[in-house]
C-alpha cells in the first residue's frame, strides 16, 4: 500500500507571490521554524491557523496528525491556493472526512475594517470580519490546542484583553507574530496590549520568546529601539 504523501513540500503552489514573500515564508517555516518553538503540533490537536496564506503551516499541522485544522485567511486567492495545497488530505483518502477535517474560512479575524488593496493586494474584500470569540461560538470550537497567528497588526484584537480568560484556560499554546509598525498608532496599540494582555500572562510565567532578553525589552519605554519590527510571542498554558 502506498504511504501518505507529505503535504508540506517544496512543490506547493505559491499563488504567484513575490520571491521576497516566498523567501520569508520558506525561512520562517523551514529554517528558523518560528512557529515550532516551545511546542509542535501533536496528533489529535485542534489547530487554528489565522493568516493561513498558502497553507504552509496547516500542511505541517496535517502532516503531524492534527485532528482538525481551521485555515482562516482574508485573501480568497491565497485561501484557494491553500485548499489546493491541502487537496492531498482528501483525494484518494477514504478516511479523510472522519480523520482529517480541514476547514477553510474566508475571513479577516481581528479586524474591524479591511483595505485589501493595501494589505493583501486585492481590490475588494467579500469575506467576513470575525472576532476570536465569534469564531469559537460559530464553529463550536470550545478548546484550541495550537493557535497560530500571523495577522499583520490584527493580533492585538485577536489576543484581546476581553478574550484573556479564554486564551488562558481554553488555548493550550499560542504562537503569534507581533508587528510593531503594521498600522497607524501601532506603538500605542502595542503598549496597551502589552500592559493588558502580555504582562498578566508574563506574571503567570506563560510567555516565551525566541530571545530571553525580550522579557525585559518589551517592558521598556524605548521598546521600539530595542525590538525588531516583528517578532514572535508564545503563550504556553500547559
State the predicted function of each range.
Residues 1-238:
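Phosphate/nucleotide-binding beta-alpha loop and adjacent structural elements of enzyme active sites
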Amino acid at each position: 500500500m502506498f504511504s501518505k504523501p507529505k503535504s508540506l513540500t517544496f512543490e506547493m503552489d505559491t499563488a504567484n507571490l513575490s520571491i521576497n514573500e516566498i523567501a520569508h515564508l520558506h525561512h520562517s517555516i523551514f529554517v528558523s521554524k518560528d512557529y515550532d518553538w516551545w511546542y509542535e503540533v501533536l496528533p489529535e490537536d485542534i489547530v487554528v491557523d489565522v493568516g493561513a496564506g498558502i497553507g504552509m503551516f496547516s500542511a505541517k499541522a496535517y502532516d503531524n496528525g492534527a485532528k482538525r485544522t481551521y485555515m482562516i485567511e482574508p485573501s480568497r486567492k491565497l485561501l484557494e491556493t491553500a485548499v489546493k495545497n491541502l487537496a492531498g488530505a482528501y483525494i484518494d483518502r477514504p478516511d479523510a472526512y472522519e480523520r482529517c477535517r480541514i476547514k477553510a474560512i474566508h475571513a479577516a479575524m481581528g479586524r474591524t475594517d479591511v483595505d485589501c488593496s493595501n494589505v493583501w493586494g486585492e481590490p475588494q474584500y467579500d469575506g467576513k470580519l470575525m472576532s476570536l470569540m465569534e469564531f469559537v461560538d460559530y464553529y463550536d470550537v470550545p478548546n484550541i490546542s495550537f493557535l497560530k497567528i500571523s495577522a499583520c497588526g490584527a493580533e492585538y484584537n485577536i489576543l484581546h484583553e476581553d478574550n484573556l480568560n479564554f486564551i488562558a484556560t481554553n488555548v493550550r499554546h499560542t504562537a503569534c507574530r507581533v508587528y510593531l509598525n503594521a498600522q497607524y498608532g501601532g506603538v500605542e496599540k502595542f503598549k496597551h496590549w502589552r500592559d493588558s494582555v502580555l504582562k498578566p500572562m508574563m506574571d503567570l510565567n506563560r510567555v516565551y520568546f525566541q530571545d530571553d532578553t525580550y522579557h525585559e525589552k518589551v517592558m521598556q519605554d524605548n521598546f521600539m529601539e530595542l525590538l525588531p519590527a516583528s517578532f514572535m510571542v508564545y503563550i504556553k498554558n500547559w
